[in-house]
Amino acid sequence: MSETVLPNHLIHFSETSLLKLPPSLYKTCKTYLNQEDIKKIQKAYSFAFYAHAGQKRKDGSDYITHPVAVTEILLELKMDPDSVCSALMHDVLEDCNVQKNNLAKIFGDDVAHIVDGVSKLGKIETKNIADNNANNLQKMALAMANDVRVVLVKLCDRLHNMRTIEYVPRKKQIQKARETLELYGPLALRVGMQDIRAELEDLSFRCIHPMRAKMLEN
């Protein structure tokens, strides 16, 4: 097998010298995964940590806090190790100049497929939902995903982004909330994720109609 050539910013990543998982991730992982699985997840965390080095979230926190939070949500669903690895690395193709074949060589074809699917699914967000039938968009998303694990990782990604949407400019908040109502809420229903669907819809409503949401609370 030929040597895997990674971008320069991943020079510190080593499969033989891995970073420790954040305590919250490790604690949940060990409740249902074996040590071999956890080591693979540790490798994915190390890869994501170095891939996102220097990147920041809108709130000023290190970007790696986002994939970690997404993974914490996914772990609540007791997902398989490849899904967990994919959640940790779900943004590396889009944001870090990493190639799909890099992931396939290091983590296997399944992980590469899921991460690539999440990246492609995210591109639907750039379409103008007003110009498309929402049901058709949902069907397109499911067809593009071709694997329910892709949809689940993307739903967890969107859920964390909606939980932290206050740091995004107001115009983009509205856009993301409408996308969530039109696409991700119904997608969650289609794959049986009722709790995620309910929270996505609640967060979207609060974003679009903050005053009405406050009135309903009182």
Go through each PLM region and give its residues.
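Active-site helical microenvironments for divalent-metal-assisted chemistry
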Residues: 1-218
